[in-house]
């Protein structure tokens, strides 16, 4: 732990968990899809759902999906910017079993139909943890370069490598 963990990240507020962490969750979702999504279905769990609109959690996640950093001054306008960019957004409460209270479940769809479903939690101070990708357990923060490989588990695939 260092002084920046205590002070919190440089960000557009009001909350390091509900705004900065949420923006990072959206950004990681974008990176896992590989490009800006055309459609985003965003489920907010626990305190994300209870106070998300007031803390700008919805706007922060969408800002991350648009490629914005947690300190981007455009975050408060991200829902309008998403509309202008052709990104269809749906935000709703969701109940997730045994999940951290600041968890988002996003299903992101690209313009050519590629999808990725990401569950991630905001841990405080702008820190996040990715919990699952397409239903498979994961545990990484995105602070360091992380390689995610998708493969087909069927006979003969390894011989093609």
Language model regions located:
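Short, hydrophobic/aliphatic alpha-helical segments
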Residues: 1-11, 40-43
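A conserved regulatory-domain signal marking ACT and ACT-like small-molecule sensing domains
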Residues: 91, 117-161
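Broad gene-expression machinery/nucleic-acid interaction feature
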Residues: 39, 86, 101-105, 115-117, ...
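Metallocofactor- and cofactor-centric catalytic cores in central/energy metabolism, strongly enriched
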Residues: 37-41, 158
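A structural-propensity feature for long, helix-poor, extended segments
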Residues: 41, 45-84
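Contiguous domain-boundary segments centered on the initiation and propagation of an alpha-helix
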Residues: 66-112
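Conserved phosphate/anionic-ligand binding catalytic regions in large, soluble enzymes, centered on
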Residues: 8-28
